[in-house]
A protein has these predicted regions:
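Short S/T/G/P-rich N-terminal loop/turn motif that feeds into the first structured element of a domain
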Residues: 1-53, 60-66, 70, 93-95
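C-terminal structural segments of small proteins and small subunits
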Residues: 62-90
Length: 95
């Protein structure tokens, strides 16, 4: 089966302000069948300007990744991080 992923890049402006989001996000992931593959908060960026945060989350399919993003639970979590970060999130599928 083709896996789905969230690829997240960007910057965190107030690290302590992100703690509630990170705690709830980490607890929420298993409830949607997802797992955190990579969390690098100080990435060594060699090209481009994606920011120092790089996160990859794996889902059982791209459809599940999209459904998780669109879920009420995740939409509520987003509000916990908005004022503390500038992040981009893209849903992708594996080959």
């Amino acid at each position: 089966m083709t896996k789905g992923y969230w690829v997240v890049t960007g910057n965190i402006h107030t690290p302590l302000g992100m703690v509630p989001y990170i705690n709830k996000f980490t607890a929420w992931l298993p409830t949607v069948g997802a797992r955190l593959l990579i969390r690098d908060l100080q990435a060594d960026v060699r090209e481009g300007t994606p920011g120092s945060v790089n996160i990859i989350v794996e889902f059982n399919s791209k459809e599940k990744a999209v459904a998780a993003y669109e879920s009420t639970e995740y939409q509520e979590l987003i509000n916990l991080r908005l004022q503390h970060s500038s992040l981009s999130l893209t849903s992708k599928k594996s080959y």
